[in-house]
Amino acid sequence: MTLLEARDLRVEFVSRGRRARAVDGVNLVVGQGEIVALVGESGCGKTTLARTLLGLERPASGSVLYGGVPLAYSSRALRAHRREVQLVLQDPTGSLNPRHTVYEAVAEGPRIHRLPAEGERVASALSRAGLRPPERFFNRYPHELSGGQRQRVVIAGALALDPRVLVADEPVASLDASVRGEILALLLRLRDELGLSALVVTHDLGLAWNIADRVAVMYLGRIVESGPVERILTAPSHPYTQALLSVLPESPSPVVLGGEPPDPTRIPPGCRFHPRCQILASGAAAETGVDGLCVSRPLPVLSSSAAAQVACHHAEARPASTRREAEAGAGVEVERR
């Protein structure tokens, strides 16, 4: 069952006469009890997409759907939507008011939505977030907590509204390595126990491997590759995905991308990744006869299908036998690690 969906979503910003296409045609679904990782480097549009799914940005075209119903932008509709779809920010220190106790921080949402049994909600949310006994934390302030405990308070603040979807923007980026695993395990436990769905926004493919059911890789406002996590991260087809994976510690040879970082005000013709593409630069695209297409023919917008799909002229042109051999080799390599 699809809970949250982006359908041909486009978001634009205009500044000093320049139009930035931050999200430039995205189809994405998050199903019931599913964790989807949205991956990409800074500036690719993933945070703007997440904010739009929350109703914090209004799309230029396309639509956001929740439970199959398009999101309306009246105050009442947005209020109801944000109770069902809650945001978890990456910096717990910045998202918690230092003058508010843990109780006040978690109770803020139920008070805004005028929900009954405030004390019980706060205690239950803290307990589900792993802060037990919850009463022990009621009167503490953020500076009295560890980084992991502060992130659990932020998660508890979302859980206090009984949402069905969490949108977590870099949920462990500011945490020590020793605490990251605890927070990821908590998100998985909430999915298993409460049936929560989650969209996890991250630049870290290692995090996606540990937590996600599906991965969507975003570059310059579009999803360029998506599919089941095992398929995408063991046998990536898009050169951008390959470059992101190559910086993981287990990778034998990192790919250094040339060219300029993505600029949403200057989207190149053809494949939007071609100015930095290592496949095009190496001559491999010319060998398959698609180098001209890479620089001239735009690629179609990927659908919201859960099956593996890629927007790449070179990947589409490679013989099926070569693709199978590459996928089999990648799978063996991951198992060996």
Kindly give the residue locations of the regions a language model identified.
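Short catalytic/signature loops enriched in Gly
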Residues: R19, S226-G329, V334-R337
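ABC transporter nucleotide-binding domains
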Residues: M1-T234, E316-R337
